[in-house]
Curated annotation (Swiss-Prot):
Xref: InterPro entries: CHP00366 (IPR006161), SCFA_transpt_AtoE (IPR006160)
Principal subcellular localization: membrane
Gene Ontology CC terms, in alphabetical order: plasma membrane
Membrane topology qualifier: Multi-pass membrane protein
Subcellular location: Cell inner membrane
UniProt keywords, alphabetically: Cell inner membrane, Cell membrane, Membrane, Transmembrane, Transmembrane helix, Transport
Protein name, per record: Putative short-chain fatty acid transporter
Membrane-spanning segments: 17-37, 49-69, 98-118, 136-156, 188-208, 252-272, 284-304, 321-341, 359-379, 402-422, 427-447
Free-text function comment from the UniProt entry: May be responsible for the uptake of short-chain fatty acids.
A matching Pfam family: SCFA_trans
Gene: atoE
């Protein structure tokens, strides 16, 4: 059954799903029209919201571009190539490759979403190189499907924000018993329902992707250039090399800047615990890449080779920033959330919050953005109904991570690394969306 659904969804997506840029543009107009028709915002207001928000994700877009290029450059270092090759050698058949990529990606995304998203795609690429007859598009889809575990992991935006004093919704939860207005991690990340949902995904996702394996003769051929071995970036100097050339290829400079970076990271983690952020992941990738490549210019050549992967991120993120601000400032996000809240009771509230979050995710594919838009409506409603605040908060996170399988926004880094288009993987991802729904329903309603 899973295989049949996968074939249908893949065929459907290949015909009707546009390029992610077209998707972002169409979403802009849909959000504009809905906000105009359903809220008090005028067209002039909405144009201003869109324009004012258009550049709001510049910092975030830079972070995403960096995680792609630094992760890609790190993967092309000789040591990481050897490591990925060793792990990939565990799989001997295309089916084993699919299971291994999904499982490893799921674990990596639980540890840190940025790390898992990039490393998963790089690992899938290595498996495709090693195992002849692999469906490359399915392997890259497996890496993105594994991203479904991130919201309940250690870098999940929602539980971390909810546990942080001064977060955008903290004032709604302040009381004598909770003066800081926080939801502790024991009520979210380390709760029974989150452990059930996250472990169920780790166990079930490899099985689901295994069942998507194409039948004999149905594996799509790909351009061999996509999985061709990456070039080497070291450079041997001649005896008459200039001082400038020697500095450019200097191991001393590479190791010195590496020592500086690792010293900072050591002090940071000593002070803050193992609190990984996207900036820390980027710094780890960058510093480690310089050290492993062995010289500043060898690393720079690897970065130049990787930058072509960032085009989609650089162009599309501003459109999503504009959509997000329209959604937030017009009140459209609140209307959608209130619609689901009004038909809920204490038991069904987290589940309906989950579906409202999934719906909003098309316009706001960001965990932190969901907390800003939905938190002010979800938290008071949960309090009024007597629903579990931790579960209601995590329901927002689950809806976002689940619907990512139908929203190409977060697939852009993986697709950039893989050299594929969104139509190549979204059929598989939407199949995973369908067959993982029961896991979230059981966890939110019955536990």
């Amino acid at each position: 059954m899973i295989s049949r659904v996968s074939r249908f969804m893949t065929t459907f997506v290949s015909k009707y799903l546009p390029d992610p840029l077209i998707f972002a543009v169409l979403l802009t107009f849909v959000t504009f029209i809905c906000a105009w028709g359903l809220t008090d915002s005028t067209p002039v207001d909405l144009v201003n919201m869109w324009g004012n928000g258009f550049w709001n994700l510049l910092g975030f877009g830079m972070q995403m571009a960096l995680i792609v290029v630094t992760g890609n450059a790190l993967a092309t270092s000789p040591q990481i190539r050897k490591f990925l090759s060793t792990i990939a050698s565990i799989a001997k058949t295309p089916a084993q490759g699919v299971v291994l990529v999904t499982f490893m990606g799921s674990i990596a995304c639980i540890i840190n979403w940025g790390f898992g998203l990039v490393v998963g795609a790089m690992f899938a690429k290595e498996v495709a190189r090693r195992i002849k007859g692999s469906d490359y598009a399915l392997l890259i889809a497996c890496a993105y499907i594994a991203f479904m575990t991130w919201g309940g992991g250690f870098s999940g935006s929602m539980p971390l924000l909810a546990a942080t004093p001064g977060n955008p919704v903290a004032h709604l939860m302040m009381s004598e018993s909770n003066p800081q207005g926080i939801i502790p991690a024991v009520s979210t990340l380390f709760s029974g329902y989150n452990i059930f949902i996250t472990l169920s995904l780790v166990i079930c996702l490899p099985f689901i992707t295994y069942m998507m394996m194409p039948k004999n003769g149905e594996t799509k051929s790909i351009d061999p250039k996509l999985i061709a071995p990456d070039p080497t970036f070291d450079k041997k100097l001649d005896k008459d090399a200039t001082l400038a050339e020697k500095m450019e290829e200097s191991r001393f400079l590479a190791y010195t800047i590496g020592a500086l970076g690792y010293s900072y990271l050591g002090m940071y983690f000593y002070k803050n615990g193992f609190n990984l952020t996207i900036n820390n992941v980027n710094l780890i990738f960058l510093i480690t890449g310089i050290v492993l490549h062995g010289s500043p210019m060898a690393y720079m050549r690897a970065i130049i080779n990787a930058t072509r992967s960032t085009a989609g991120i650089l162009v599309q993120f501003p459109f999503y920033a504009g959509v997000q601000l329209m959604m937030e400032h017009s009140g459209l996000g609140g209307l959608i959330t209130e619609f689901f809240i009004n038909v809920a009771n204490k038991d069904s509230f987290p589940l309906l919050t989950f579906f409202s979050s999934a719906f909003i995710n098309f316009a706001v594919p960001s965990g932190g953005g969901h907390w800003v838009i939905q938190g002010p409506f979800v938290i008071p409603a949960a309090q009024a109904l007597g629903a579990d605040l931790g579960k209601s908060t995590m329901a927002i996170a689950y809806g976002e991570q689940w619907m990512n399988m139908a929203q190409p926004f977060w697939a852009l880094p993986a697709l950039g690394i893989a050299g594929l288009g969104v139509r190549d993987i979204m059929g598989f991802c939407m199949t995973a969306l369908i067959f993982t729904a029961p896991i979230f329903i059981i966890g939110l309603y019955f536990l």
